[in-house]
């Protein structure tokens, strides 16, 4: 990560973030927590199952991301899904079966799926 030393650096960083965000518009973003506790709880298996389900159903416009701790250790593995034009939704306790269900029910149909973790923060966009 580059060091921000001036207001111009900050403006350039903001534009870089906005450009990355614009490239994602219209895509479904699936962000899987792969911190140590999530990996130990089966996070990699959940991510692989979701990737397999996306491929099996021929879905396009789905981007996978990996993140570190989402601070929901009690609910690992956790997955944050952002559907186009919607706020992100975080799901907890995502095992292989739940991962596949998230793709077929939530990603493909927009249907709510059990395991939503209530939002306890507000996003700040620079």
UniProtKB/Swiss-Prot annotation:
Optimum pH is 8. Inhibited by oxygen. Gene3D superfamilies: Glutaredoxin. It catalyses: H2 + NADP(+) = NADPH + H(+). GO terms for molecular function: hydrogen dehydrogenase (NADP+) activity. InterPro entries: Thioredoxin-like_sf. It comes from the Bacteria. Transmembrane segments: none annotated. Its EC number is 1.12.1.3. The keyword Oxidoreductase applies. Keywords: NADP, Oxidoreductase. Catalyzes the reduction of NADP in the presence of molecular H2 to yield NADPH. Heterotetramer composed of HndA, HndB, HndC and HndD subunits. HndA and HndB could form a heterodimeric intermediate in the electron transfer between the active site of hydrogenase subunit HndD and the NADP reduction site of the reducing subunit HndC. This is NADP-reducing hydrogenase subunit HndB. It comes from Solidesulfovibrio fructosivorans (Desulfovibrio fructosivorans). The lineage of its organism: Bacteria, Pseudomonadati, Thermodesulfobacteriota, Desulfovibrionia, Desulfovibrionales.
């Amino acid at each position: 990560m580059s060091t921000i030393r001036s207001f111009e650096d900050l403006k350039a960083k903001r534009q870089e973030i906005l450009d990355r965000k614009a490239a994602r518009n219209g895509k479904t973003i699936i962000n899987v927590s792969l911190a140590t506790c999530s990996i130990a709880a089966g996070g990699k298996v959940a991510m692989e199952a979701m990737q397999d389900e996306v491929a099996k159903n021929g879905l396009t416009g789905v981007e996978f991301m990996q993140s570190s701790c989402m601070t929901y250790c009690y609910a690992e593995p956790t997955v944050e899904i952002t559907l186009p034009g919607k706020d992100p939704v975080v799901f907890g306790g995502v095992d292989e079966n739940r991962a596949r269900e998230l793709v077929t029910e939530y990603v493909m149909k927009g249907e709510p799926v059990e395991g939503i973790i209530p939002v306890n923060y507000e996003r700040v966009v620079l």
